Amino acid sequence: MKTGERSPFLTIMLVMGLAFLYIPMILLVIYSFNNSRLVAVWGGWSTRWYVELFKSPEVWDAVILSLQVAVVNATFATVLGTLAGLAMVRFGQFKGRTLFGGMLAAPLVMPEVITGLSLLMLFITLKGIIGWPEERGATTITIAHITFSLAYVAVVIQSRLTGMGQTLEEAALDLGARPFRVLMDITLPRLAPGMVAGWLLAFTLSLDDLVIASFVTGPGSNTLPILIYSRIRTGLRPDINALATIIILAVAIGVAIAGIIMLRQQKQRERELAMAD
Protein backbone atom coordinates (compact mmCIF):
# COMPACT_ATOMS: atom_id res chain seq x y z
CA MET A 1 0.00 0.00 0.00
CA LYS A 2 1.40 3.37 -1.01
CA THR A 3 1.94 6.12 1.51
CA GLY A 4 -1.20 8.26 1.80
CA GLU A 5 -3.55 5.57 0.44
CA ARG A 6 -6.49 4.59 2.59
CA SER A 7 -6.68 0.99 3.64
CA PRO A 8 -10.06 -0.55 2.67
CA PHE A 9 -9.96 -2.64 5.84
CA LEU A 10 -9.47 0.42 8.07
CA THR A 11 -12.24 2.27 6.23
CA ILE A 12 -14.64 -0.64 6.70
CA MET A 13 -13.75 -0.92 10.38
CA LEU A 14 -14.27 2.82 10.85
CA VAL A 15 -17.69 2.69 9.16
CA MET A 16 -18.70 -0.35 11.22
CA GLY A 17 -17.58 1.34 14.44
CA LEU A 18 -19.51 4.51 13.68
CA ALA A 19 -22.56 2.48 12.68
CA PHE A 20 -22.36 0.48 15.90
CA LEU A 21 -22.27 3.72 17.90
CA TYR A 22 -24.85 5.83 16.10
CA ILE A 23 -27.46 3.48 14.57
CA PRO A 24 -29.00 2.75 18.01
CA MET A 25 -29.25 6.49 18.65
CA ILE A 26 -30.86 7.09 15.25
CA LEU A 27 -33.40 4.33 15.89
CA LEU A 28 -34.15 5.80 19.31
CA VAL A 29 -34.80 9.23 17.78
CA ILE A 30 -37.03 7.76 15.06
CA TYR A 31 -39.11 5.70 17.49
CA SER A 32 -39.55 8.71 19.78
CA PHE A 33 -41.95 9.98 17.08
CA ASN A 34 -43.85 6.68 16.99
CA ASN A 35 -47.60 7.10 17.51
CA SER A 36 -48.02 3.58 18.88
CA ARG A 37 -47.88 2.73 22.58
CA LEU A 38 -45.94 -0.39 21.63
CA VAL A 39 -42.31 0.58 21.28
CA ALA A 40 -41.44 -2.03 18.65
CA VAL A 41 -44.58 -1.51 16.53
CA TRP A 42 -44.58 1.47 14.18
CA GLY A 43 -47.87 3.39 14.28
CA GLY A 44 -47.06 6.46 12.22
CA TRP A 45 -45.38 9.76 12.94
CA SER A 46 -46.51 11.73 15.97
CA THR A 47 -45.20 14.11 18.64
CA ARG A 48 -47.68 12.91 21.27
CA TRP A 49 -44.96 11.49 23.53
CA TYR A 50 -43.12 14.79 23.62
CA VAL A 51 -46.36 16.53 24.61
CA GLU A 52 -47.02 14.00 27.37
CA LEU A 53 -43.42 14.24 28.49
CA PHE A 54 -43.57 18.00 28.97
CA LYS A 55 -46.82 17.64 30.90
CA SER A 56 -45.20 15.29 33.44
CA PRO A 57 -44.18 17.09 36.69
CA GLU A 58 -42.10 14.06 37.69
CA VAL A 59 -39.92 14.45 34.61
CA TRP A 60 -39.51 18.19 35.12
CA ASP A 61 -38.52 17.70 38.76
CA ALA A 62 -35.90 15.14 37.72
CA VAL A 63 -34.56 17.39 34.95
CA ILE A 64 -34.27 20.42 37.24
CA LEU A 65 -32.60 18.39 40.00
CA SER A 66 -30.13 16.80 37.56
CA LEU A 67 -29.19 20.15 36.04
CA GLN A 68 -28.76 21.79 39.45
CA VAL A 69 -26.56 18.97 40.69
CA ALA A 70 -24.56 18.85 37.45
CA VAL A 71 -23.85 22.60 37.36
CA VAL A 72 -22.82 22.82 41.02
CA ASN A 73 -20.77 19.63 40.75
CA ALA A 74 -19.00 20.77 37.58
CA THR A 75 -18.16 24.17 39.07
CA PHE A 76 -16.76 22.86 42.36
CA ALA A 77 -15.00 19.94 40.66
CA THR A 78 -13.34 22.32 38.19
CA VAL A 79 -12.09 24.62 40.96
CA LEU A 80 -10.83 21.78 43.16
CA GLY A 81 -9.49 19.75 40.23
CA THR A 82 -7.61 22.77 38.90
CA LEU A 83 -6.02 23.40 42.29
CA ALA A 84 -5.08 19.73 42.56
CA GLY A 85 -3.61 19.71 39.05
CA LEU A 86 -1.59 22.84 39.78
CA ALA A 87 -0.28 21.27 42.98
CA MET A 88 0.81 18.10 41.19
CA VAL A 89 2.50 19.80 38.22
CA ARG A 90 3.64 23.25 39.33
CA PHE A 91 4.62 22.65 42.97
CA GLY A 92 7.35 20.14 42.10
CA GLN A 93 8.30 17.52 44.65
CA PHE A 94 6.76 17.99 48.09
CA LYS A 95 6.27 15.77 51.10
CA GLY A 96 3.34 13.43 50.58
CA ARG A 97 3.15 14.05 46.83
CA THR A 98 2.98 10.36 45.97
CA LEU A 99 0.25 9.74 48.54
CA PHE A 100 -1.67 12.79 47.35
CA GLY A 101 -1.43 11.65 43.72
CA GLY A 102 -2.60 8.16 44.64
CA MET A 103 -5.58 9.45 46.61
CA LEU A 104 -6.44 11.82 43.76
CA ALA A 105 -6.41 8.98 41.22
CA ALA A 106 -8.30 6.50 43.41
CA PRO A 107 -11.80 7.50 42.23
CA LEU A 108 -10.73 6.82 38.64
CA VAL A 109 -10.20 3.11 39.30
CA MET A 110 -12.60 2.52 42.18
CA PRO A 111 -15.77 0.60 41.22
CA GLU A 112 -18.80 2.87 41.36
CA VAL A 113 -20.65 0.43 43.60
CA ILE A 114 -17.88 0.66 46.20
CA THR A 115 -17.75 4.45 45.92
CA GLY A 116 -21.51 4.74 46.32
CA LEU A 117 -21.61 2.35 49.26
CA SER A 118 -18.74 4.07 51.07
CA LEU A 119 -20.35 7.50 50.63
CA LEU A 120 -23.66 6.13 51.88
CA MET A 121 -21.94 4.82 55.01
CA LEU A 122 -20.24 8.20 55.44
CA PHE A 123 -23.53 10.10 55.34
CA ILE A 124 -25.20 7.63 57.70
CA THR A 125 -22.29 7.96 60.15
CA LEU A 126 -22.32 11.77 59.96
CA LYS A 127 -26.05 11.84 60.62
CA GLY A 128 -25.56 9.68 63.70
CA ILE A 129 -22.73 11.89 65.04
CA ILE A 130 -23.68 15.47 64.11
CA GLY A 131 -27.22 15.07 62.81
CA TRP A 132 -26.32 16.01 59.24
CA PRO A 133 -27.56 15.41 56.64
CA GLU A 134 -31.12 15.25 57.94
CA GLU A 135 -32.19 13.56 54.73
CA ARG A 136 -30.42 12.41 51.60
CA GLY A 137 -31.15 14.33 48.42
CA ALA A 138 -29.65 17.01 46.19
CA THR A 139 -26.90 17.94 48.66
CA THR A 140 -25.65 14.40 49.20
CA ILE A 141 -25.80 13.64 45.47
CA THR A 142 -23.80 16.78 44.70
CA ILE A 143 -21.12 15.97 47.27
CA ALA A 144 -20.87 12.42 45.97
CA HIS A 145 -20.48 13.60 42.39
CA ILE A 146 -17.80 16.13 43.33
CA THR A 147 -15.71 13.41 44.99
CA PHE A 148 -15.22 11.49 41.76
CA SER A 149 -15.58 14.29 39.19
CA LEU A 150 -12.67 16.34 40.55
CA ALA A 151 -10.33 13.41 39.86
CA TYR A 152 -11.23 13.50 36.16
CA VAL A 153 -10.85 17.28 36.04
CA ALA A 154 -7.44 17.00 37.73
CA VAL A 155 -6.26 14.59 35.02
CA VAL A 156 -7.36 17.02 32.28
CA ILE A 157 -5.65 19.95 34.02
CA GLN A 158 -2.43 18.01 34.61
CA SER A 159 -2.29 17.05 30.95
CA ARG A 160 -2.86 20.65 29.89
CA LEU A 161 -0.22 22.00 32.29
CA THR A 162 2.34 19.42 31.19
CA GLY A 163 1.95 20.49 27.57
CA MET A 164 2.05 24.21 28.33
CA GLY A 165 5.55 24.50 29.68
CA GLN A 166 6.68 27.17 32.13
CA THR A 167 8.67 29.55 29.92
CA LEU A 168 6.24 32.46 30.15
CA GLU A 169 5.71 32.02 33.90
CA GLU A 170 9.45 31.91 34.56
CA ALA A 171 10.02 35.00 32.39
CA ALA A 172 7.33 36.91 34.29
CA LEU A 173 8.83 35.91 37.63
CA ASP A 174 12.30 36.98 36.46
CA LEU A 175 10.85 40.39 35.55
CA GLY A 176 9.54 40.83 39.09
CA ALA A 177 5.92 39.70 38.84
CA ARG A 178 4.44 38.15 41.97
CA PRO A 179 3.45 34.45 41.80
CA PHE A 180 -0.24 35.25 42.31
CA ARG A 181 -0.15 37.78 39.45
CA VAL A 182 1.55 35.22 37.22
CA LEU A 183 -1.11 32.67 38.11
CA MET A 184 -4.00 35.03 37.34
CA ASP A 185 -2.59 36.76 34.25
CA ILE A 186 -0.65 33.98 32.54
CA THR A 187 -1.31 30.48 33.87
CA LEU A 188 -5.10 30.51 34.24
CA PRO A 189 -5.82 32.19 30.86
CA ARG A 190 -3.63 29.61 29.12
CA LEU A 191 -5.31 26.91 31.17
CA ALA A 192 -8.83 28.07 30.26
CA PRO A 193 -9.46 25.51 27.45
CA GLY A 194 -8.51 22.69 29.82
CA MET A 195 -10.77 24.11 32.51
CA VAL A 196 -13.67 24.34 30.06
CA ALA A 197 -13.05 20.75 28.97
CA GLY A 198 -12.88 19.65 32.61
CA TRP A 199 -16.12 21.48 33.44
CA LEU A 200 -17.93 19.85 30.54
CA LEU A 201 -16.55 16.43 31.48
CA ALA A 202 -17.67 16.84 35.11
CA PHE A 203 -21.09 18.09 33.96
CA THR A 204 -21.53 15.09 31.67
CA LEU A 205 -20.38 12.60 34.31
CA SER A 206 -22.89 14.02 36.76
CA LEU A 207 -25.79 13.89 34.29
CA ASP A 208 -24.87 10.33 33.34
CA ASP A 209 -24.37 8.89 36.83
CA LEU A 210 -26.84 6.30 38.01
CA VAL A 211 -25.00 3.95 40.36
CA ILE A 212 -23.53 6.41 42.87
CA ALA A 213 -26.60 8.66 42.87
CA SER A 214 -28.88 5.70 43.60
CA PHE A 215 -26.89 5.00 46.79
CA VAL A 216 -26.88 8.53 48.21
CA THR A 217 -30.31 9.80 47.16
CA GLY A 218 -33.49 9.69 49.19
CA PRO A 219 -37.25 9.49 48.57
CA GLY A 220 -38.49 12.16 46.20
CA SER A 221 -35.02 13.11 44.95
CA ASN A 222 -34.74 11.28 41.65
CA THR A 223 -32.20 12.40 39.10
CA LEU A 224 -32.90 11.87 35.41
CA PRO A 225 -30.93 8.58 35.11
CA ILE A 226 -32.70 7.20 38.18
CA LEU A 227 -36.09 8.19 36.76
CA ILE A 228 -35.32 6.64 33.38
CA TYR A 229 -34.05 3.42 34.98
CA SER A 230 -37.09 3.13 37.25
CA ARG A 231 -39.44 3.54 34.28
CA ILE A 232 -37.56 1.07 32.10
CA ARG A 233 -37.82 -1.58 34.82
CA THR A 234 -41.61 -1.57 34.35
CA GLY A 235 -41.25 -1.88 30.57
CA LEU A 236 -39.85 0.20 27.75
CA ARG A 237 -42.17 3.13 27.02
CA PRO A 238 -42.25 5.57 24.06
CA ASP A 239 -41.96 8.61 26.33
CA ILE A 240 -38.55 7.34 27.45
CA ASN A 241 -37.43 7.47 23.82
CA ALA A 242 -38.63 11.08 23.64
CA LEU A 243 -36.77 11.96 26.84
CA ALA A 244 -33.58 10.29 25.61
CA THR A 245 -33.85 12.15 22.29
CA ILE A 246 -34.06 15.49 24.11
CA ILE A 247 -30.97 14.56 26.15
CA ILE A 248 -29.05 13.63 22.98
CA LEU A 249 -30.03 16.94 21.38
CA ALA A 250 -29.01 18.93 24.47
CA VAL A 251 -25.63 17.17 24.66
CA ALA A 252 -25.00 17.73 20.95
CA ILE A 253 -25.77 21.44 21.28
CA GLY A 254 -23.54 21.72 24.35
CA VAL A 255 -20.64 19.99 22.62
CA ALA A 256 -21.05 22.19 19.54
CA ILE A 257 -21.05 25.38 21.61
CA ALA A 258 -18.01 24.25 23.60
CA GLY A 259 -16.20 23.35 20.39
CA ILE A 260 -16.90 26.76 18.88
CA ILE A 261 -15.70 28.54 22.02
CA MET A 262 -12.50 26.50 22.22
CA LEU A 263 -11.84 26.97 18.49
CA ARG A 264 -12.18 30.73 18.84
CA GLN A 265 -9.86 30.73 21.84
CA GLN A 266 -7.31 28.67 19.91
CA LYS A 267 -7.42 31.07 16.96
CA GLN A 268 -7.06 34.03 19.30
CA ARG A 269 -3.98 32.49 20.92
CA GLU A 270 -2.49 31.81 17.49
CA ARG A 271 -3.05 35.44 16.48
CA GLU A 272 -1.45 36.66 19.71
CA LEU A 273 1.57 34.42 19.15
CA ALA A 274 1.85 35.62 15.55
CA MET A 275 1.75 39.26 16.69
CA ALA A 276 4.36 38.53 19.36
CA ASP A 277 6.69 37.07 16.74
Where are these regions (language model features)?
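Transmembrane-helix boundary motif in ABC transporter permease subunits
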Residues: 1-5, 72-104, 124, 259-263
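N-terminal signal-anchor/first transmembrane alpha helix
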Residues: 1-27, 100
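Transmembrane alpha-helices
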Residues: 13, 18-25, 153-158, 164-165, ...
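Generic hydrophobic transmembrane alpha-helix motif, especially the helices
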Residues: 103-141, 152, 193-196
